[in-house]
């Protein structure tokens, strides 16, 4: 069920990001290697909304945590993080908590350096790491989300 929700969430992200003025969003499709899906892409989406260029990976999580090791695109996202005007990160839907959170890849880097194994939903309130809740209005299953919050983050996010 989580896989189905995850794919549907990716589509909902695309729809909601596209609502931003002059936004452009492109889906990078995963490649097949035999029977296994192997992504060589840096992210699910490449997005643009003046003045920022985004590499966004979308993840759906049932519980309180998202494992740092579950982010297979970590290295490729990190390569893109330190370019002025360019942002790389993960949009995580904690669906049991009805929260959508943006976590910059630089936060994943800091979590690893600090010996943390996962992003916990509670970290949002602790404010020890850079992450931001995406303003969202609950629908039946999904949300209408306002990704303009990503345009207001400081450089390095």
Predicted regions and their residues:
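Charged phosphate-binding loop/patch that engages nucleotide di/tri-phosphates or the phosphate backbone
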Residues: 124-157
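Acidic-basic catalytic patches of nuclease active cores, encompassing PD-(D/E)XK
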Residues: 1-36
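Conserved catalytic cores of phosphodiester-cleaving nucleases, focusing on short active-site segments
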Residues: 45-63
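Nucleic-acid nuclease catalytic cores
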Residues: 81-110
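Short, conserved beta-strand edge motifs with alternating hydrophobic and charged residues
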Residues: 28, 55-58, 91-92
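Beta-rich catalytic cores
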Residues: 41
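Active-site-adjacent loop/helix micro-motif of nuclease/hydrolase catalytic cores
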Residues: 37, 62-74
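A contiguous, mid-protein "functional segment" used to position or interact
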Residues: 103-123
């Amino acid at each position: 069920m989580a896989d189905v929700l995850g794919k549907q969430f990716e589509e909902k992200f695309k729809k909601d990001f596209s609502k931003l003025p002059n936004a452009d969003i492109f889906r990078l499709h995963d490649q097949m290697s035999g029977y296994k899906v192997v992504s060589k892409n840096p992210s699910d989406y490449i997005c643009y909304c003046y003045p920022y260029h985004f590499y966004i990976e979308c993840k759906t999580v049932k519980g309180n945590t998202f494992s740092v090791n579950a982010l297979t695109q970590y290295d490729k996202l990190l390569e893109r993080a330190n370019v002025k005007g360019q942002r790389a990160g993960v949009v995580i839907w904690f669906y049991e908590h009805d929260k959508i959170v943006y976590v910059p890849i630089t936060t994943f880097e800091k979590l690893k350096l600090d010996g943390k194994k996962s992003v916990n939903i509670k970290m949002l309130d602790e404010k020890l790491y850079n992450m931001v809740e995406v303003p969202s209005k609950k629908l039946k299953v999904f949300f209408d989300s306002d990704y303009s919050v990503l345009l207001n983050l400081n450089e390095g996010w």
